Amino acid sequence: DQGVKIERNEKVEKPADLRKDYDAVLMAIGGHKGVRLPMEGSSLEGVILNVDFLKNCGMGKATGMGKKVIVLGGGNVAFDCARSAKRLGAEEIHVACLEAREHMTADEEEIQQAVEEGIMIHPAQTFERITGTGHVTGVDFMNVKSFTFDENHRAVIHREENSEHHIEADTVIFAVGQRPDITEEAGLALGRGNSIAVRDIETDKATSVDGIFAAGDAIYGTKSVIMAIESGREAAAQIDQYLGGNGDISEKLAPEQKPDAYIGICEGFGYMQRKNRCI
């Protein structure tokens, strides 16, 4: 109804090529590529990426999940995977993450509901290796005393001595983050976590190529839906200015109505008990 034309099944390898036909381009591609940690056993059969698992769940396709599942990660997506596995019939489900319990990034409600469903939580764990020959048989862990990040944003982990332990599993799901599905061949400068670099995440959504802007998870990683909407609106306002407008994209979805402060007379109001005065 608004004149938007949707082109489906189109692959755009170089966004700059779109500038031949369009005055401005917005990259709102999200973060739909799962992260596979470069650790021993990560390529074994039975190791699944979060986005693939949840996509297959949503489409009713086979997930490749077994009966004993370990989810590596402590955010909301990790618990989405764990609780989905529960509903798909997994008999034993573990969620393990690097953060201590009080610092886990998942919503507290998600964590509590998972525990109520019988999902086992293992905070402050480092993933040493995924075991198996051909197919996953489990994961070796060690307890984490503390961890920090170096100047390259790599985790520096302080392990507890003699704390190595093993949890058996036939399925391991990586849920340690997502990234935009884009490469340097696209011709845009990229930032941390394969994000699209913009001049300023908060105030300037322009990319390294003139006329191309970016917004949402593609520039700052996986956040909430409302943050993506806000980022998209900010980008739309900036694009409007780029095209010669004033950047005002506000709209009134319904006419404003000023309520009438007068609600009438209630006989004997002054003699009523306070609890009966509420309307």
Predicted regions and their residues:
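Cofactor-binding loop segments of dinucleotide-utilizing enzymes, especially the Rossmann-like FAD-
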Residues: 30, 74, 97-100, 217
